[in-house]
Amino acid sequence: MDMGIPCSQLARRLLGKMLCRRIEGRTTKGMIVETEAYLGKEDKACHSYGGRRTERNSAMYMKAGTCYVYRIYGRYECFNISSVEAGAGVLVRALEPLCGVSEMRERRGGRVKDRDIANGPSKLCIAMGITRREIDKEWIAGSEKIWLEEGREVADPEIVAGRRIGIRNCGEWEEKKLRFYIRDNEFVSCIRRRELGNRKHGSVQQLP
């Protein structure tokens, strides 16, 4: 997959791709069903806003396709892939588990429904065994630990665009439609009715 495309395009293009993770010879895979684009120094919701560059976010300034893993709330981790612009990247928000599902469920604590295994950015990190120590700064196009495979093509009419989740105090950037997900996919983390017009869907916010 060509990573050398603008961040918002990459966020859409990643939908339908298979995220694969190998640990001690065992591989788990999930189809990416939800993403968010963070556009770099101009984006007030982005870790690199204003050109901010630290050891924590340095992966966002590396070549397109570099994995960026960070922690929230001191315990949960989130997985991102850098895009071609300096400081920009795509947050992978949700997966549809497809291979090694029982192992993914076990990592999530055992008795978890399939749709709840990886329907959130930190849930998917737990399910896939993605940690900052192991995966941050890995290049996804050349890693034996984590990589992408072709899944299925997601046509434009299948893609819903909406506001990113949990963005506060960022002015106009709170309203930017930079979150993308596959329409009617039950593994998406959160669906807002207004993003789907008159269609009857719930609006449920899940664990990060």
Swiss-Prot record:
Record Gene3D superfamilies: Methylpurine-DNA glycosylase (MPG)
Role summary: Hydrolysis of the deoxyribose N-glycosidic bond to excise 3-methyladenine, and 7-methylguanine from the damaged DNA polymer formed by alkylation lesions.
TM regions (residue ranges): none
Catalytic activity field: Hydrolysis of alkylated DNA, releasing 3-methyladenine, 3-methylguanine, 7-methylguanine and 7-methyladenine
Record's subcellular location: Nucleus
Gene Ontology biological process terms, A to Z: base-excision repair
Keyword set includes Nucleus: yes
The UniProt record lists the keyword DNA repair: yes
GO cellular component, one term: nucleus
Family matches, as SUPFAM superfamilies: FMT C-terminal domain-like
Annotated EC: 3.2.2.21
Protein name (Swiss-Prot/TrEMBL): Probable DNA-3-methyladenine glycosylase
Keywords assigned by UniProt, alphabetized: DNA damage, DNA repair, Hydrolase, Nucleus
Listed GO MF terms: alkylbase DNA N-glycosylase activity; DNA binding
InterPro entries: Formyl_transferase-like_C_sf, MPG, MPG_sf
Family note: Belongs to the DNA glycosylase MPG family.
